[in-house]
Amino acid sequence: MKKLLVFIGLVLLNFQIKAQVDAKAKKVLDEVSSKTKSYTSINAEFSITVENLKNKSTSTQLGKLTLKGNKYKLEVNNQVIISDSKTSWTILKDASEVQINNVEAKEKETGINPSNIFTMHEKGFKSEFVKEEKQKNGAVYQIIKLYPEDVKKKNFHTAVLTINKEKQQIVSIKILGKDGTDMIYQVKSFNANSAVPETVFVFNDKNYPGYEVIDLR
C-alpha cells in the first residue's frame, strides 16, 4: 500500500509540474503572438536547412520573406511565391513558369506556411516549455516544444521553437519529420513596420515576360 501511495504521489506531482510548464509555455507564446500581431509588416531574411538523418546529408538554402497580415512574398533560390491571401502565384524561374492556385482556408488557419510561420503555435498544438539558454552575446533564448494535437494529419511529430526572450521574437523553428528528415528555419535578420505597398502581393506579368502561366484553380 505504501509503495502504491508513493507511486500515486509521484504521478500527481509530475502532472502538477507538467501543468505549470505548459502554463509557462502558453504565457511565452501568447507574448510572441501579441508582439508579432502588433507589427504592420515584417521583412525577414532566413535560411532553411534540411537534415536527412537516414543518409546523414544536409543542404541549406537562403530566402527572403515579406509579410503583411495574411499576405506574403517568399523568395527562395529560383522560386518566388506571392499571395494576396486569396490567390497564390508560384513563379518557377528555372522553368519560366507561373502556377496560380487558390489559398485554402484550412492551410491559412492550421498549416505551416509563410503567412503564419511566426504564429503557427496558436492552433492545433500542445506546448511544453523546455528551458532558457543564455547566449554569448547576453541574449536569453527560450526553448519551447510543440506537439500536433492531430499528429496523424501532420508529416512531423514535433516542432522546436527558439525565442528571443527580450525581443519576444522567434529566431528559429526546427520541424522534426516522421520520415527522419528535419527542417530548420533560422531567422538571419528581422525588420518590422516598414512601408510595404500592396503591389508586392500581386503578380505582375510584366516582370516575367515569356513565362507560361498555368491556372490550377
Which positions does each model-derived feature cover?
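An acidic-aromatic
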Residues: 62-111, 183-184
